A protein has these predicted regions:
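Divalent-metal-activated hydrolytic enzyme cores
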Residues: 11-39, 50-143
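Conserved functional hotspot residues or short segments at active or partner-binding sites
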Residues: 43
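Catalytic core of membrane glycerolipid acyltransferases/transacylases, capturing the structured
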Residues: 1-12
């Protein structure tokens, strides 16, 4: 089969009505769904994600003033960050955030009217996965 791949920092799909939009990500979604008519859409995060680690730090302390565009982009992690149990160790909080970001991104993807319609009509399936960099294992997340 064929693949159409779009990547960005921390593998974020922002909310459909976000003020911090990334038109590249939105255009890629629209192209994949409307033009290519992909039957499967995979939101794939990975362990040891530098973007997630930077985003985690972004919420623990004040954002770095030198990161204008990075700060704006990583602000999209807010919904996932709010769900991180603060009782976990820092390492486990970051691991949780890696997975939660995939879940939230899947929910955000379902806000796109065309995506919602295609899923409802069983013309599109969406999967949330985490790739473990160390082991090579792929974990399917419950969404």
């Amino acid at each position: 089969g064929d693949f159409f791949i779009h990547r960005n920092i921390a593998n974020i799909i922002p909310p459909y009505k976000s003020s911090k939009t990334d038109h590249s990500t939105f255009a890629a979604i629209e192209y994949a769904v409307k033009v290519l008519k992909v039957p499967n859409f995979i939101v794939l995060g990975h362990t040891s994600c530098g973007g997630i680690k930077t985003g985690y730090s972004h919420y623990l302390k004040k954002p770095n003033k030198n990161y204008k565009f990075i700060n704006s982009w990583l602000a999209n992690l807010g919904a996932a960050y709010k769900n991180v149990p603060k009782t976990l160790s820092v390492k486990n909080q970051i691991n949780f955030l890696e997975e939660e970001n995939v879940r939230v991104s899947v929910y955000n993807l379902l806000e796109f009217p065309i995506v919602k319609k295609m899923v409802k009509n069983k013309k599109l399936s969406i999967y949330g996965l985490i790739y473990n960099i160390s082991s090579g294992d792929i974990k399917s997340l419950k969404i």
